[in-house]
Amino acid sequence: MASKQKGPTLKGTRRLKSLSLGHKLALGPHAQLLFDEMLHAADAQLYASTIILAATIVDVALHECEEGEEGLGLAYLTAPERKALDWLRGRRNGLVHYKGVVSGMGKSAKDVTAIANDAERALQSVIPLMETLENYG
């Protein structure tokens, strides 16, 4: 974020960090690196980066698997959890595929609050997937 204006601390990092302690998550090396960087971005209040990394982790975690195995899929998630991941993908796409100004990308306090809220929502969206991966770990 080019602005020096800092927004709120993201609360979702606490739950995600507790899941990552002791490497309990069944993440491959690619997803694990992205996961760690997402947590660092969230702590640094890099909200757009947090959203982009969260959505990317979902894609990688669902498709990264041992040779000969199938990816995890989303069948075990509830409809609201899948809807949250759909929102996350759409929000990430709005950030990385420029088609005009999107909410939260300005320098005003309102924009900082908007992107911070979306970053928090992004973290909350990936928690159910990470909790499932903890069970597989």
Go through each PLM region and give its residues.
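Generic recognition of short, well-ordered alpha-helical interface segments
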Residues: L33, S49-I52, G90, R121
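Alpha-helix N-cap/helix-start motif at coil-to-helix transitions, marked by capping-box chemistry
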Residues: L25-P29, I52, R82, D86-R89
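Charge-enriched, short contiguous segments at helix-coil
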Residues: P80-G137
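Short non-catalytic regulatory patches outside canonical folded cores
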Residues: V60-L88, Y98
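Single-residue recognition of alpha-helix boundary sites
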Residues: T56, E70, V102-G104
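Short, hydrophobic, well-ordered secondary-structure elements
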Residues: L39, D43-E66
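A short, mixed-charge helix-start or loop-turn motif at secondary-structure junctions
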Residues: L19-L21, L74, S108
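Charged alpha-helical initiation segments
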Residues: M1-L46
